[in-house]
């Protein structure tokens, strides 16, 4: 039995929505959402199959090339990341509160002073971030800071600034308008992480997400 499913897709960045919206929350463009209908067919075993999708390829036919990695200006960081940070990748920097994740993330950006970077914080104000950066005494010439808890506004800033690396600190302190749930809830964290990953892949911008891990 066939079943049609309707969704709306942004023609500019590929973001999806279950309903028609005027402004894309990912790329910020207006009037780019178009209706897309997919047909799902129920199988005899009770499963479903999609008529549209990726096709299987022989491994030897897949074209692959070595990714250009970003030098983190640290031999230890480069080693942990397999030789550097891959553009479009998402890295989770997790740990218990208070162990220095935010300081480490800021140090990473300040080591990359020759590159344009963005530090988006939902925990500290711009003044607090500047004071902490001055204590680290690194190169902040091309470092942008943003005190914001809205995922949409953070991604808008990334689109505007076009940094080569973005830190979001922390994933538990930001929220998206696309779902009705409190900031820090599991549904918000999952949705925000998924949206950031989608944006990173589409725009080829690497992100480092700071995440708190509680004993509970």
What are these regions (language model features)?
Residues 48-139, 155:
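The Walker A/P-loop phosphate-binding site
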Residues 187-208, 212:
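Substrate-engagement module of ASCE P-loop NTPases
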């Amino acid at each position: 039995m066939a079943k049609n499913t309707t969704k709306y897709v942004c023609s500019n960045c590929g973001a999806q929505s279950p309903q028609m919206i005027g402004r894309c929350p990912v790329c910020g463009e207006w009037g780019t959402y178009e209706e897309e209908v997919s047909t799902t067919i129920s199988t005899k075993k009770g499963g479903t199959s999609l008529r549209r999708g990726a096709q299987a390829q022989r491994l030897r036919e897949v074209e692959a090339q070595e990714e250009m990695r970003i030098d983190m200006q640290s031999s230890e960081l480069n080693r942990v990341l397999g030789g550097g940070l891959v553009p479009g990748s998402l890295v989770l920097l997790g740990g218990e509160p208070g162990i220095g994740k935010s300081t480490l993330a800021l140090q990473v950006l300040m080591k990359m002073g020759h590159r344009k970077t963005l530090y988006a914080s939902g925990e500290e104000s711009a003044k607090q971030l500047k004071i902490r950066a001055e204590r680290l005494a690194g190169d902040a010439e091309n470092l942008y800071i943003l005190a914001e808890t809205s995922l949409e506004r953070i991604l808008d800033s990334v689109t505007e600034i076009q940094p080569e690396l973005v830190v979001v600190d922390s994933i538990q302190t930001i929220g998206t308008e696309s779902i009705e749930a409190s900031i820090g809830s599991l549904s918000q964290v999952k949705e925000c992480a998924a949206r950031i990953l989608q944006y990173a892949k589409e725009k080829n911008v690497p992100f480092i997400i700071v995440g708190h891990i509680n004993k509970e």
